[in-house]
Amino acid sequence: MSVAGLKKQFHKASQLFSEKISGAEGTKLDEEFLNMEKKIDITSKAVAEILSKATEYLQPNPAYRAKLGMLNTVSKLRGQVKATGYPQTEGLLGDCMLKYGKELGEDSAFGNSLVDVGEALKLMAEVKDSLDINVKQTFIDPLQLLQDKDLKEIGHHLRKLEGRRLDYDYKKRRVGKIPEEEIRQAVEKFEESKELAERSMFNFLENDVEQVSQLAVFVEAALDYHRQSTEILQELQSKLELRISLASKVPKREFMPKPVNMSSTDANGVGPSSSSKTPGTDTPADQPCCRGLYDFEPENEGELGFKEGDIITLTNQIDENWYEGMLRGESGFFPINYVEVIVPLPP
């Protein structure tokens, strides 16, 4: 910084100290200017908080948001274009219902109904994904631009005005000790900054209909989401009512106990051998797992490192490129093409 710059910073600091500590009064700006400044301040706070809350509205789970942020950052670093989507709660519940509905089979009324509801929830998750994309492009991104460009520029003008106001007031208090030319230049710069700040605030506030339009687009997107979701649920309700009606017309079966098959020793009065297999002692199915084909060294936080030949327990497939798993008590993510699946994850 030049000597003149250091001198100016000293003037500002000295004037600010006088106002805060000694109670010296600085130049007052007009009421209209102060009202605009207040509205700009409220607007800046509103935009910042709305951006945060809008993201929470679309993606309410902070843990998933953090995980997605990390995964998408890793994907970008590795040159992968496709981003991982947020796991919608409707889709997670739908997957669960589809899984157990298919396991119960087509001869189960409950199983068939679970499949119906699961498929409907998966459709709702797709509609929610569309809402996410739509709201981000038409509401969140424009608000972010407003914050990063227009409001940031106004803030710059206001800070510059305050700096020049302090410089002017410092020199004004020292009339006779400071050359009149310096005071005149300080007045000109102060008035120039005031006009710039005033014009930028005025133009912004006069055009706030743009923000109203963005709100209208947001409401339209939310309305479209709820309209499509309502249609899906109404169709699902009709399906379930039909299943209830059909199930009520099926004749009820009576329970008929089946006789126990007796062995030849049982027929002679000898009980079953104590060495016979006790029900329920079957070995449980193996956990989903995979074997490392190559060594994988984690480069980012949250990745799981392993050596060639390590057996890793699979817990989740994040996308077509990444698994989530556990090894020696540690959990993390690793690339699919580094492993060979031994026992696959359930569908």
Curated annotation (Swiss-Prot):
Membrane topology: Peripheral membrane protein
Region annotation Required for dimerization upon membrane association: where it falls in the sequence: 60-87
UniProt subcellular location: Cytoplasm; Early endosome membrane
Residues in SH3 domain copies: 285-344
Alphabetical UniProt keywords: Coiled coil, Cytoplasm, Endocytosis, Endosome, Lipid-binding, Membrane, SH3 domain
GO molecular function, one term: lipid binding
Region feature Interaction with ARC, mapped onto this chain: 218-254
Record Pfam families: BAR (PF03114), SH3_1 (PF00018)
Residue stretches in coiled coil: 180-201
Job description of the protein: Implicated in endocytosis. May recruit other proteins to membranes with high curvature.
Complex formation: Interacts with ARC, DNM1, SGIP1, SYNJ1 and DYDC1. Interacts with FASLG. Interacts with ATXN2. Interacts with BIN2.
Domain notes: An N-terminal amphipathic helix, the BAR domain and a second amphipathic helix inserted into helix 1 of the BAR domain (N-BAR domain) induce membrane curvature and bind curved membranes.
Family: Belongs to the endophilin family.
Protein name as catalogued: Endophilin-A3
Gene of this entry: Sh3gl3
